[in-house]
Amino acid sequence: MNENQRLLSVQNRTHLSVRQLAVFVLSLLMVGAMVLTNQRDNAVVESLVTPVPVMPVVSVDQRISTSWFCPGVPGNDGTISGSIIVSNPSDADFNATVTRLGVGVSPVVTAVTVAARSQAVVNVKEGIESPFISTIVEILGGVGTAEQFINHPAGNSVAQCANEPATDWYFADGFTGADSLDHIVLTNPYSDSTVVDVSFVTTESTREPSRLHGFVIPPRSVIALNMADEGARNEPVVAVEVHASAGKLVVGRSQHYLGDGRLGYTMALGASGLSSEWWFADGEKLDGSTEQLVILNPTRSDATLSVMFVNGANPDTQSEPASVIAPAGSVTLFDTGTLPNVPNGRYGIIVSTVGEPGVEAPGIVVEQVINRRVGNTVGTSVVLGAPMGAMSTVWVAPSGVSSGIDDAMLILNATPIEGTVTVSQIGPAGEVAIAGLESVLLPASGLVSIPVPAGISNGEIVVRATVPVVVQRMLLRGHELTGRSAVLALPTIPSPEVGS
């Protein structure tokens, strides 16, 4: 099948109208409630869709310790540095250990004390040499969070850290055009070997290299696969699936874009499962920007998708959702600019699979690629959407946000009910609302761009809303580069009641 055949089929109207958004959201909440009920009853249900968010979350449960598994930092280039930010929002100090892993080297362990209401920054590359270095953060107590930061000449990047290793990992997007560097970073944090099967999908075919079948990752080590060397050279899209047949692991993707419409650097954690819905808080139809949704359907059945664009406008003026066919075992490219009725400006995007009555909707993985052009240069951002079950009234950004810009955060209202949000920062006085952001109006089924004032010091950011929301950060890329890098904040799960 060629690239044109892989491109989606878009219809002008579909089964779901904007007027039905309330019913759509309520049905999702009912599904989540049923899943939780089944879990309590120990019911066993076979499904391709993981019933819990396939992304990192902040747990409200009391724990003796909390672990974070970070996806990796390039270690063999002196122009690139990396750090782990450990955040403590509580009123008491806590102790943590940061373990660095590489290939062919012994783990390096550092003990850290994080003072109350503050952060600690740990140099990833200190004391270890390896092509890629991954870290494990173990916190005594359940209140701390961690994120990874990479300072790269092609653009700085913040990556989420996983709550735990998993058997399956997915990336819908990947790019090796113009000899761009696409590394899949495999981290085995355990004392036993992990055995994986790695396959990838391009616009032309699905490939399962024999070298990557039964591929062994030694204990407590990190191995990076250069996808061009694995047979995916100069490909406009390289979707990757990693399955562990023995053990579990953490998988990240390091991308250095060198041309063919993309420039910059990103590092991201993969999706640890499939989801029947993906939410994006920063859709863009702006001068100089192009937007593409990259959809991986690794299942054996074709999937029908609904792609809804929401911006809080009058339902009578909202565009109808697009209907998309994602063929089985394929990657589908959806250029939102091809739809004439997509609203100008910024909007939220909801991608959901459509199941037959009485049949559970299949799972997919969706990433969003935005290229922002200013003059003769481009800045590329890639972000995985928020999966089913991730909507929450409380989100945290452990490493903070970029200040002095008018789009530091985009917040999408996941309900048809008007709400408000409060944006606070953790500091010496605890959690304190940022001036001007104490009560920001959030339109029903709409989104709001949050400007963070210049001069705000580094610190964990907390977003509290009166309705379930999705929160995405838009970060400066540093080095006087154009555009933004994008990463979600972390949802608190289960979603706290308003005022708790």
Across the structure, where does each feature detected by a protein language model lie?
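Solenoidal tandem-repeat scaffolds enriched in leucines and small polar residues
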Residues: 172-185, 189-260, 269, 279
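Hydrophobic alpha-helical membrane segments, chiefly transmembrane helices and signal peptide h-regions
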Residues: 19-39, 96, 240-242, 305, ...
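Conserved functional hotspot residues at active sites or interaction interfaces
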Residues: 20-83, 144-189, 248-298, 358-416, ...
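N-terminal Lys/Arg-rich, disordered targeting/topogenic segments
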Residues: 1-14
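Short acidic, flexible loop segments centered on an aromatic residue
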Residues: 83, 87-106, 185-208, 244, ...
